[in-house]
């Protein structure tokens, strides 16, 4: 039974407070990854930041903890314009958002630094990029400076809406939804899955947010954009937000249900939380793999 008095944050803290100490007890020196995945506006960014603060308060005196969103690795605005031209007939890759619109070289460089942090004693920090979604009238651009994190990194939190989505093997897996513009997106998704959640070198805990109606994303994303505009004075119009979310729906329809059923985001354990339109928890599942 789901305890309706508990919030998403309550369940997430309980989960991590169980598995993180167990991880440290193993004496493993490689970084522990914490993957957050959930639809846009579901609260994964808010929750992951709260978890970062919780872990900093609990372990920050003795452990190095990093936090990033997959959004922070978006292509620069200039490079996104080049991608727009390269895939000018693919509506899903026109603008940031989907697999294929991130700087994979930068992501790999950051991951390599985190993984090899014991091999370079002369390097004491890793720089995590930051992305400003309000630039260029909501099209966004990378910030000129990033965030420095002390090496070696003990815990690295990464959140993103498609983390854990597994690409379809064309010719082997039959899926009527894998057509048109989604063929390119699916092909690019392999790079992410191989580098992150399917990477056998990464030891991870997964937290998954799912919902009873994927159309909740429209309302959530509008709420987010209104909050952004109130803070910085610029952002997307409601019509732009709706069109923006439309580009994500083919991916949700193709990957989301299988991903949620698999409960496999974390290589060690995965917590899956079902939330309604008000972000109240209506179901919980925990799967321990290791």
From Swiss-Prot:
Keyword Kinase: yes
Superkingdom of origin organism: Eukaryota
Chief subcellular location: cytoplasm
Compartment list: Cytoplasm; Nucleus
Record GO cellular component, one term: cytoplasm
Residues noted as binding ATP in the record, renumbered to the chain: 38-45
Keyword Thylakoid on entry: no
InterPro entries: P-loop_NTPase (IPR027417)
Keywords: ATP-binding, Cytoplasm, Kinase, Nucleotide-binding, Nucleus, Transferase
EC code(s) of this entry: 2.7.-.-
Molecular function via GO: ATP binding; kinase activity
Phenotype on disruption: Leads to cell death when overexpressing the camptothecin mimetic TOP1-T(722)A mutant.
Other remarks in the entry: Present with 4280 molecules/cell in log phase SD medium.
Free-text function comment from the UniProt entry: ATP-dependent kinase whose specificity is not yet known.
Similarity-based family: Belongs to the GLYK kinase family.
Protein name per its UniProtKB record: Probable ATP-dependent kinase TDA10
Native source species: Saccharomyces cerevisiae (strain ATCC 204508 / S288c)
Lineage: Eukaryota, Fungi, Dikarya, Ascomycota, Saccharomycotina
